[in-house]
């Protein structure tokens, strides 16, 4: 089944492999994404009338808010960008304006489409690269030679190509012509400045300018791959498709939305620009036209997912108009000791599996006893209770501390099996978790 055509149940089943619990949040995301697919199956006139129901996710850091949205965008190949609301300033102040999040989305969308096109042409690109390098390594065939010599040259070229593909000649150096690196355009500036940037680049930088470079065959493969890709790809078609996809199926995840809420608890320490950022954000979420370097994009069919911990403020502290643009709200549960244990043992790419794979590169086999995993979950949970609650992110810190010496002295353990026991976990973490000051500064 096409990933774009996943049913809500299939979406939740997929998310269950990577994220423990948070059933309600998974359900909301699954329905919202399925509705994108449903809308695209309707006739054009009705499509325009149906706008996405934006979601507000409420929960502490590290409980899975970002991961749920990111995983879904990845599996369904949707244009996705994650931004932090606290990084923006209202128009007229120094800093990033909120429209830049839409430009970032379009950039990601175009890159996504470009990579898909490159994947389709992968074999053709690699063949062209190998042929070009082979011709550089072989002396050119003189004109007017016999058919027999031409056949010999063709056979030599074929053998040379096979050796290049197999990596036998990766260290050999060759001189090739490569196009000058194009100048990057800052897409976060206002449209007027963006156009000035593009015009200046056209004047001072010619795309066709090339320079000679001496590279290894391995480096030449990558340099030529990028160049040949550009000649084979239809850049205009990619830009148009990227714009269209961002417009119809893009997802913008706005984290830390609570940081721009105006809380009565803050009293006189209120930042006057917070409401300004909310008001600047409002037309984008409601639906407006944003200019990007690839063209204009309408934002009314982009799905916005906002998230925040709301420890110092409440969702009702956002301006009413913005609250109304996030009609679906879901609260994510805090992580218990049991959930911590499940995260370590039941997720498809758990932190434990990641560390085991990393150390296996050094020839070290790491095994965790079940009691050790339970102790890790318990101590991580306790550390969250005594210090700032950072959710599942605490597990990275505690496991890193337990495996610190083994990771550093990995070559001494090469070819051995190392078992992580409950006693080892306690010896590494017990005193740290017991001391509240040490928890704050070390864990």
UniProtKB/Swiss-Prot annotation:
Gene Ontology molecular function: ATP binding; ATP hydrolysis activity; peptidase activity; proteasome-activating activity
One example of a Gene Ontology biological process annotation: protein unfolding
Keywords linked to the UniProt accession: ATP-binding, Chaperone, Cytoplasm, Nucleotide-binding, Stress response
Cell compartments where the protein resides: Cytoplasm
Free-text function comment from the UniProt entry: ATPase subunit of a proteasome-like degradation complex; this subunit has chaperone activity. The binding of ATP and its subsequent hydrolysis by HslU are essential for unfolding of protein substrates subsequently hydrolyzed by HslV. HslU recognizes the N-terminal part of its protein substrates and unfolds these before they are guided to HslV for hydrolysis.
Family membership: Belongs to the ClpX chaperone family. HslU subfamily.
PANTHER family assigned: ATP-DEPENDENT CLP PROTEASE ATP-BINDING SUBUNIT CLPX-LIKE, MITOCHONDRIAL-RELATED, ATP-DEPENDENT PROTEASE ATPASE SUBUNIT HSLU
Protein name listed in UniProt: ATP-dependent protease ATPase subunit HslU
Species annotation: Helicobacter acinonychis (strain Sheeba)
